[in-house]
Amino acid sequence: MQKGIIKLNTLPSILSNGSVVGKKEHDGPLGDCFTFEMPTWEQSESEMQRLALNEALDKSGFKIHDIDAIFAGDLINQCTSSGYGLANFDAPFFGLFGACSTIAEGLLLGS
């Protein structure tokens, strides 16, 4: 991993995405828009993080070594689910904790 100031060769962009949800979200009006469901959020959050990243990589055609950094967070203290779910990926991980603002925080920091 590079140390110091990082200068990007290309502008940041969102090239792919993946989404996973719990049972209640899947049973809602947008249920068909999601990739994955599990019985409870707590049982599945780490797996959901892993699946979402794999889904985004698969859709984009990228491999993990093409990724400069992962910005992710969750609603469990100290980004436990994100940390465990993404631990086996060989890319720098930035754990975000902003509760409901985590998605906006990730988009802002990632861009």
Predicted regions and their residues:
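Conserved "HGTGT" condensation-loop signature of ketosynthase/thiolase-family condensing enzymes
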Residues: 1-94
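Active-site-proximal alpha-helical scaffold in enzymes
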Residues: 97-111
